[in-house]
């Protein structure tokens, strides 16, 4: 009897704990056991052909740090804003966003125009799309750009979630600049003072004058032009007129202790659109015609403004000093190897008087060639000059080049306490060395010389990125920007010809050579080794 009661109580207890439609009570509704997820994936792979199966296996997926669709879309928008704000290579922005959207499994399309990125997110369930316009302007910031790339790579490697990455990007966007305005003006002073003897043949006195001009220019650019929209429109012309006027006035001193070409060229080196023309050349080489052509035309007009300002400043001083103007005309005539006259030629020793006068232009060559061997990089440097008026010897490049590379990285907002700063300086020094050696053997071809220097930079930067996990773009920027003033000095300087069109043509020749060298080095490095699944963050 006790056994029956216990069995009844056990049965009633089980019936109270289980639902009536539980499969353990009603076996006719029990569902068959589902296959394991691995078995389902194997069955799906078995139905694919070889190429589709291999592509599916190599695809990167987010498995651990999963975020909602809205958070992933916000991350893509914030990433687009950060890349534009910190000066990422414009021809790589669209490919990076597409790679991030593919790995995050977000249906999105991106269109990059100058100053704006159009992001379109699709919804397959509703059959609609949502379009966002990300408008942002900025300048090159190497430290922040390196952090953006680390965040981007952490999300794609499934190390952090999209929501965490969005917060980190927002913190970067609102963070203040690492250096004050006064310190950046001091950096501009040092850079112009160092590039004056290095690339434009300036003397010890010239470098200080060009440094002062660059300090004033940087203060006007960072402080005055940033607060006055009216002055920002005429900033380039006014500063180039001021620098050229001061340089021409100092060079007119009778003892010839200052060089106009060295001071004016190095004084405006901080506002040359070298990076802008380089990015436009890279855009055109990447078949991005809209952005590339717009930036190229803007950079050329910008360069014409600078050339126009330099010419106006020089001519305005010569208008006030006619003696100096006559002296320059006589100097130009004495340096020419030929002399031309236009008129009528008639022989005086004719006997019959029937000679016909000849009308035309007559050119006479000099029997004694002009003494121009003392002109170095457009500056007159006689051997009897004191040490502070002579060009710097070659051994000083071993001191000036690393120092210039170090200060150039700081001026592009690279943090002082970072291991990548040493890599930037090393690559930049290799860039200058290869450029100098190539210029020794190849004459009057600034584009080919710049291509060799850019190939060296690209090779070292991409190998550093592949083998040591660094960011290729930020490590290469200093070396690439070093090639622009070096290439211009090989093309005859910025003010040697006095024409803005010639300056623009020289800059285009240099940047086309840099573009070819960078693309060739990248193609060589990425030909070997495993293929990257994400977009390349390089030039």
Language-model features and meaning:
Residues 139-484, 491-539:
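Alpha-helical transmembrane segments and their membrane-interface boundaries
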Residues 104, 484-487:
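Conserved NTP-handling cores and scaffolds of large molecular machines
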Residues 1-163:
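Soluble N-terminal domains of membrane-associated systems
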């Amino acid at each position: 009897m006790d056994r029956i009661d216990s069995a009844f109580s056990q049965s009633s207890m089980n019936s109270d704990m289980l639902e009536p439609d539980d499969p353990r009570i009603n076996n006719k509704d029990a569902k068959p056991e589902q296959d394991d997820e691995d078995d389902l994936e194997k069955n799906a792979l078995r139905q694919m052909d070889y190429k589709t199966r291999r592509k599916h296996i190599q695809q990167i997926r987010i498995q651990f740090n999963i975020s909602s669709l809205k958070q992933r879309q916000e991350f893509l928008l914030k990433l687009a804003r950060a890349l534009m704000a910190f000066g990422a290579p414009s021809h790589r922005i669209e490919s990076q966003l597409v790679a991030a959207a593919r790995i995050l499994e977000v249906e999105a399309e991106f269109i990059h125009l100058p100053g704006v990125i159009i992001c379109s997110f699709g919804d397959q369930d509703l059959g609609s799309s949502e379009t966002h316009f990300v408008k942002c302007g900025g300048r090159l910031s190497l430290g922040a750009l390196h952090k953006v790339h680390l965040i981007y790579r952490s999300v794609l490697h499934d190390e952090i979630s999209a929501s965490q990455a969005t917060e980190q990007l927002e913190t970067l966007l609102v963070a203040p600049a690492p250096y004050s305005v006064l310190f950046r003006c001091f950096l501009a002073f040092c850079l112009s003072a160092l590039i004056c003897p290095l690339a434009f043949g300036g003397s010890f006195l010239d470098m200080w004058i060009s440094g002062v001009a660059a300090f004033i220019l940087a203060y006007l650019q960072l402080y005055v032009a940033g607060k006055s929209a009216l002055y920002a429109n005429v900033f380039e012309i006014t500063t180039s007129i001021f620098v050229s006027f001061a340089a021409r006035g100092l060079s007119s001193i009778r003892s010839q202790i200052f060089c106009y070409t060295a001071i004016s060229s190095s004084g405006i080196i901080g506002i040359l659109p070298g990076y802008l023309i380089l990015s436009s050349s890279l855009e055109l080489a990447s078949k991005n015609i809209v952005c590339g052509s717009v930036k190229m035309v803007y950079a050329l007009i910008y360069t014409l403004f600078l050339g126009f300002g330099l010419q106006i400043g020089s001519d305005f001083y010569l208008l006030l000093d006619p003696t100096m103007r006559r002296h320059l005309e006589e100097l130009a005539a004495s340096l020419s190897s030929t002399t031309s006259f236009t008129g009528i030629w008639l022989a005086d020793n004719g006997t019959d008087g029937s000679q016909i006068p000849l009308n035309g232009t007559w050119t006479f060559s000099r029997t004694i060639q002009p003494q121009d061997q003392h002109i170095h990089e457009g500056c007159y440097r006689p051997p009897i000059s004191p040490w502070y008026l002579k060009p710097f010897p070659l051994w000083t490049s071993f001191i000036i080049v690393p120092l210039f590379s170090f200060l150039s990285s700081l001026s592009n907002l690279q943090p002082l306490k970072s291991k990548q700063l040493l890599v930037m300086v090393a690559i930049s020094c290799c860039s200058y060395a290869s450029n100098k050696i190539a210029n020794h053997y190849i004459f009057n071809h600034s584009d080919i010389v710049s291509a060799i220097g850019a190939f060296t930079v690209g090779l070292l930067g991409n190998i550093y990125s592949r083998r040591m996990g660094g960011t290729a773009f930020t490590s290469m920027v200093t070396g690439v920007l070093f090639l622009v003033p070096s290439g211009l000095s090989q093309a005859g300087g910025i003010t040697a010809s006095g024409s803005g069109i010639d300056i623009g043509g020289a800059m285009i020749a240099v940047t086309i050579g840099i573009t070819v060298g960078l693309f060739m080095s990248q193609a060589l490095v990425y030909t070997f080794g495993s293929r990257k699944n994400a977009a390349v963050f390089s030039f």
